[in-house]
Amino acid sequence: MSKTAFSSPNHGERRLGPPDMIIIHYTGMETSAAARTRLCDPAAAVSAHYLIDVDGTIDQLVDEARRAWHAGVSEWDGETDINSRSIGIELVNKGAGSDYHPFPAAQMAALIDLITDIVARHDIAPKDVVGHEDIAPGRKIDPGPKFDWERLRRLGLATGPRLP
């Protein structure tokens, strides 16, 4: 698995120890360049640890030891500082718009490789690999109904989604 490093200034100290969750997002943008620009813009005050393009290219934007700013107002298992306990992965995808868009095979393969690697290094349970929609229901809808949760379940990487 090949990763390209970019540096987002939007991060801080983890407050709760090492990560024990993975949060999957979609960018809601047309291109990886547009998403990378936003995720690395200090004025935007948002970031993620990883950005995966439709061709499977993985960009690392924030070191895993740092707290990326991707979860916003959210909650999981009674904890509200999800950014401090998670690794955020953004998938380049237009999102809902007029219709949800599929996630290409190369992108899903790269995501599976990345999740497998992160889970092994941080001992993250499948129940804690979730979507943004799971930690911020009613506020967020990503990665949405076209995301292949069933594939992640079959591989033992996730148990989601939580929401219908």
What is each PLM-predicted segment?
Residues 1-80:
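N-terminal catalytic cores of peptidoglycan-degrading enzymes
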Residues 17, 84, 124:
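Structured loop/turn residues at beta-strand edges in well-structured enzyme cores
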Residues 21, 86-88, 128:
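Structural preference for beta-strand elements that scaffold enzyme active sites
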Residues 24, 89, 111:
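Conserved, mostly hydrophobic/aromatic
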Residues 26, 91, 133:
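Residues immediately flanking
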Residues 51, 88-90, 130:
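Conserved beta-strand segments that form the floor/walls of ligand-binding pockets within enzyme
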Residues 80, 94-164:
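Basic/polar, cationic surfaces and motifs that engage anionic cell-wall
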Residues 80-91:
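Short coil-to-beta-strand
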